[in-house]
């Protein structure tokens, strides 16, 4: 059972690592709250996308063409907007 869990975990990590940048991440990403979304009385729109910090991206964790839009930086991820 432990070997199966390790194999599945490794497959997920490899799939994430080999994800193509050209894929439209806005359709498959996790939404997050940008500063520009602001507090609204009827709820907030989540216009940002959560990006995992990896070595290939800049210091802010966002890929090319995206900018950091969150209130504070996360330890493993940042909220980015196109």
Swiss-Prot record:
One of its GO terms (molecular function) is sodium channel regulator activity. Residues 1-19 form the signal peptide. Disulfide bonds join 32-79, 34-69, 62-80. Coiled coil: none annotated. Keywords: Cleavage on pair of basic residues, Disulfide bond, Ion channel impairing toxin, Nematocyst, Neurotoxin, Secreted, Signal, Toxin, Voltage-gated sodium channel impairing toxin. Residues 20-26 form a propeptide. GO terms for cellular component: extracellular region; nematocyst. It is found in: Secreted; Nematocyst. InterPro entries: Myo_ane_neurotoxin_sf. It comes from the Eukaryota. The keyword Hydrolase does not apply. Belongs to the sea anemone sodium channel inhibitory toxin family. Type I subfamily. Binds specifically to voltage-gated sodium channels (Nav), thereby delaying their inactivation during signal transduction. Causes death to crabs. This is Delta-actitoxin-Aeq2b 3. It comes from Actinia equina.
